[in-house]
Swiss-Prot record:
Source organism phylogeny: Archaea, Methanobacteriati, Methanobacteriota, Methanomada group, Methanococci
Protein's gene: moaA
Cofactor comment: Binds 2 [4Fe-4S] clusters. Binds 1 [4Fe-4S] cluster coordinated with 3 cysteines and an exchangeable S-adenosyl-L-methionine and 1 [4Fe-4S] cluster coordinated with 3 cysteines and the GTP-derived substrate.
Domain Radical SAM core: 4-230
Sorted UniProt keywords: 4Fe-4S, GTP-binding, Iron, Iron-sulfur, Lyase, Metal-binding, Molybdenum cofactor biosynthesis, Nucleotide-binding, S-adenosyl-L-methionine
NCBIfam families: moaA_archaeal, PRK00164.2-1
Function (record text): Catalyzes the cyclization of GTP to (8S)-3',8-cyclo-7,8-dihydroguanosine 5'-triphosphate.
Full protein name: Probable GTP 3',8-cyclase
Length: 298
């Protein structure tokens, strides 16, 4: 199904918890700032995910909070699995990944994205408050060992860690990971000092690239191949191109369909009708009809 701007729906991002075992100073809680204790069960998540396939969803991304904190995360993956869903991935901070990687693979997970903003233990602890970067590195290596691949490393580019980017690039090249360089979105006034313009970096990478590929169903995002390393740039802010080609809807941990990453005022409650035994399709249609580009072409 297409929204009224002609954008097809191809993926669903499911937040399965609002809890996290780190306290990163920049965290925006998936754009849904709620302390609701209403959680979806694995079965409910499975029903919602499978309903989404009727509207064109073929890819599911599991996120949080930190999704690996849910002890039933493997059961959730098993409930999501469906022949119509071609790819199930999960975004994690990696702290718990080493011990869970094999179980996640056995449950049906295809691949993981791991957040890694620095390899420097002191800076990592400063960013996350009390995280151990060695656990993340070990988790990444274990995930690759059990074929949760292609593995992507998410690097959030900020003024305090941009100097570490070359080391992150070398690390990703050595282990065969894809690197995503993500633009920092300073949603609070006190965070604006951490903003870093990644446009010059993208231009530099583009000049060095051996090959450039356009991902047509991922906001027309460019993928650069540099000395064997795949690099992508994610720039949602003030980016009409990002919005124009967006094919994703979101499901919050407490059961609301979210038409837009950057809006929290047009959610559609899907968990309440599910628990009443209602058909969920009208709620998906309502969500899709509420979709519009946050940043429009000027």
């Amino acid at each position: 199904m297409k929204d009224k701007f002609g954008r097809e729906i191809r993926s669903l991002r499911i937040s399965i918890t609002n809890k996290c075992n780190l306290q990163c100073f920049y965290c925006h809680r998936e754009g849904h700032d709620s302390n609701n204790d209403r959680y979806m069960t694995p079965e409910e998540i499975g029903i919602i995910a499978k309903t989404s396939t009727k509207f064109g969803v073929k890819k599911i991304k599991i996120s949080g909070g930190e999704p690996l904190l849910r002890k039933d995360v493997c059961e959730i993956i098993e409930n999501i699995k469906d022949e119509r869903i071609k790819d199930i991935s999960l975004t994690t901070n990696g702290i718990l990944l080493e011990n869970l990687a094999e179980k996640l693979k056995d449950a049906g997970l295809n691949r993981v994205n791991v957040s890694l903003d620095t390899l420097n233990p002191e800076l990592y602890k400063k960013i996350t408050k009390f995280g151990d970067v060695e656990r993340v590195i070990n988790g990444i290596k274990k995930a690759i060992d059990v074929s949760l691949t292609p593995l992507k490393v998410n690097f959030l580019a900020m003024s305090i860690n941009i100097k570490d980017l070359p080391d992150i690039m070398e690390f990703c090249r050595d282990i065969g990971a894809i690197l995503q360089i993500i633009e920092f979105i300073p949603l609070k006034e006190e965070l604006k000092g951490y903003y870093y313009n990644i446009s010059p970096i993208e231009n530099e990478i583009k000049e060095k690239a051996d090959k450039v590929i356009t991902r047509n169903f991922m906001q027309n995002r460019k993928k650069y191949i540099v000395d064997g390393l795949e690099i992508e740039f994610v720039r949602p802010m003030d980016n009409s191109e990002f919005c124009m080609h967006c094919t994703r809807i979101r499901l919050t941990y407490d059961g609301y369909l979210k038409p837009c990453l950057l809006r929290d005022d047009n959610l559609v409650d899907v968990l309440t009708p599910l628990r009443k035994g209602e058909n969920l399709e009208p709620y998906f249609i309502e969500c899709i009809n509420r979709r519009e580009p946050y940043f429009k072409i000027k």
